[in-house]
């Protein structure tokens, strides 16, 4: 199993290994490209990483259709936006904008454009369907994270 040094995947795989009393042979790599090469060249059976990042990595392979992302996960790690803690006016603008984009369907269209459709100039399609966590946040917007 390939795991890129410095990522949260390192801690997740170690926690999983300990919780399930397993001995997983994992290869630490310097970057995503090296991890992908280990799997592509059959020197590793798997690559542990955020699903959306894996989708991007796989999409760049000439034989992308030979790889898949499992539905199972080692944990949930929400992405977020950061801005100054004491900037309530800016937070209000961000909240209003995001909620408006969700209500109008614009955010769903953007998601489809970038994750489910061919992306110029190479017309690569990540084929990355919206997961249940993202669907829930679109249905019930919150600044609390997942």
Model-derived segments and spans:
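Bilobed "Venus flytrap"/periplasmic-binding protein-like clamshell domains
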Residues: 1-34, 51-55
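Solvent-exposed, acidic/flexible segments
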Residues: 2-6, 28-32, 47, 84-87, ...
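Second-shell loop/turn segments in exported
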Residues: 3, 40-44, 96
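Ligand-binding clefts/hinges and TM-proximal coupling segments of bilobed small-molecule sensing domains
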Residues: 8-17, 65-66, 99-145
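A ligand-binding cleft/hinge motif common to bilobed small-molecule-binding domains
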Residues: 11-17, 38-41, 45-75
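Generic alpha-helical structural signal
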Residues: 14, 55, 91-95, 108
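Periplasmic-binding protein-like
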Residues: 51, 59-95, 117-140
């Amino acid at each position: 199993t390939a795991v890129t040094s410095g990522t949260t995947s390192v801690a997740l795989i170690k926690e999983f290994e300990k919780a399930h009393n397993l001995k997983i042979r994992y290869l630490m790599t310097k970057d995503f490209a090296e991890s992908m090469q280990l799997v592509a060249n059959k020197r590793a059976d798997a690559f542990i990483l955020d699903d959306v990042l894996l989708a991007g990595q796989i999409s760049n392979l000439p034989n992308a259709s030979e790889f898949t992302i499992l539905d199972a996960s080692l944990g949930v790690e929400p992405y977020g936006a950061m801005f100054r803690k004491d900037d309530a006016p800016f937070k209000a603008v961000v909240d209003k904008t995001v909620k408006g984009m969700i209500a109008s369907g614009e955010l769903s269209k953007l998601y489809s454009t970038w994750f489910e459709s061919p992306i110029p100039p190479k017309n690569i399609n990540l084929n990355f369907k919206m997961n249940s966590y993202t669907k829930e946040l679109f249905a019930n917007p919150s600044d609390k994270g997942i």
